[in-house]
């Protein structure tokens, strides 16, 4: 196992990860950049789509103490480490679940905040399905924040606009773009 401590939004988190999970030795630039642009509300109920070892959902759980936070990933190894990291950091309002996209998420669950570091290697069809499923699982006024590699930014803008009717590019860096869509 790989252990490290890293500050997220000015406060430390303790992580355990392993080889074979995305960015095992330190938090990836894309996720850190995304977290700088998310507007957390104390009572948000969030979902971290493709959580890896957990940083987005863990941060939501800490920043939004009155809400419940679900972290999902289709990789069972990532899910085990995300569970461990939530326990280790005493995040009792976070739950981690194995799910390919929204497939195994309770149908009646509604979220006010969706966060994702979309994997560059998933297909565009896959991304589009995630957006449709997310839309259906979001309450009115909910926000969907995503970080993608710059090569996917036009695709994200088109897809968010088709599914949500809006798309707001919050930041474009050298490598990554942060995009937000809001459900009416």
Report residues per predicted region:
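SAM-dependent Rossmann-like transferase core, predominantly class I methyltransferases
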Residues: 1-42
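General small-molecule cofactor/ligand-binding pocket signal
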Residues: 16, 95-97, 168-170
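Conserved SAM/SAH cofactor-binding pocket of Class I
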Residues: 29-107, 113-116
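A short SAM/SAH-binding and catalytic strip from SAM-dependent methyltransferases
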Residues: 112-125
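A short glycine-rich, Lys/Arg-flanked "PGG" loop and its adjoining helix->strand segment in the class I
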Residues: 128-140
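Conserved beta-strand signature within the Rossmann-like core of class I S-adenosyl-L-methionine
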Residues: 141-149
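Conserved class I S-adenosyl-L-methionine
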Residues: 149-165
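Core SAM-dependent methyltransferase catalytic element
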Residues: 172-184
């Amino acid at each position: 196992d790989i252990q490290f401590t890293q500050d997220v939004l000015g406060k430390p988190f303790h992580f355990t990860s392993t080889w074979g999970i995305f960015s095992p030795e330190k938090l990836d630039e894309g996720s850190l950049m995304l977290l700088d642009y998310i507007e957390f509300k104390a009572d948000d109920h969030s979902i971290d789509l493709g959580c890896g070892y957990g940083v987005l959902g863990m941060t939501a759980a800490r920043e939004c103490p009155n809400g419940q936070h679900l972290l999902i990933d289709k990789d069972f190894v990532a899910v085990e480490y995300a569970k461990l990291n939530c326990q280790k950091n005493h995040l009792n309002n976070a739950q981690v679940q194995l799910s390919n996209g929204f497939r195994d998420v309770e149908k009646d669950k509604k979220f006010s905040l969706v966060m994702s570091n979309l994997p560059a290697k998933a297909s565009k069809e896959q991304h589009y399905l995630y957006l449709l499923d997310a839309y259906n699982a979001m309450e009115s006024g909910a926000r969907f924040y995503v970080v993608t590699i710059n090569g996917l930014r036009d695709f994200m803008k088109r897809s968010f606009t088709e599914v949500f009717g809006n798309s707001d590019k919050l930041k474009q860096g050298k490598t990554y773009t942060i995009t937000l869509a809001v459900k009416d």
